[in-house]
Amino acid sequence: MSNNKNSNIEILKNDSWPLELRPNPSQLPSVTDTYFLKTKEIVSSYGDTEVTYAIFMRRPVISALNPAIDWLEEIVKERKGNVNIKRCFKEGSDVGAGEPMIYISGSMLLLVDLETALLQKIGATCVAAYNARSMVESLRKTSFLAMDARHCAGRYGRFNGLWCVCWFTKSKI
């Protein structure tokens, strides 16, 4: 399947996986950045290694990692792999700019092609939670109608500002 925006529509067709756990393993190539697909090919040919991802935002957010962690655990289970996940903040906690929210350790072959979807799941939920709270705190006596797609808009854009650092390690966290 080619890696383009039109292929994202295919994710919604004929999928038995729950909506919140999409994309499923067979759909990942259509939503994964080409860089990560090529990296997986290279690692596959030269040998796997243990990596640790430290995921953080370049702006303040609220920790809203549960959907991303649920998705990651389901994908890892489907692939019959193992990862070590270390959360740095409780769900709903304030997270400062640059503070690691989560560390994920495991096989690079297992994790590398999950990065695009994982970062989108983390970025969207954490920014949306922060923006929603900011609106409520700013306008305490106002009722709100949820326009979910708009919560991530603003100065930083929908997913801009999410960064992931990957360390090559020999030990788990």
Predicted regions: what is each one?
Residues S2-L109, A117, K121:
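Flexible, solvent-exposed loop/hinge segments and secondary-structure transition points
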Residues N4, E91-V95, I102-I173:
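Buried, small/hydrophobic-residue-enriched core segments of structured protein domains
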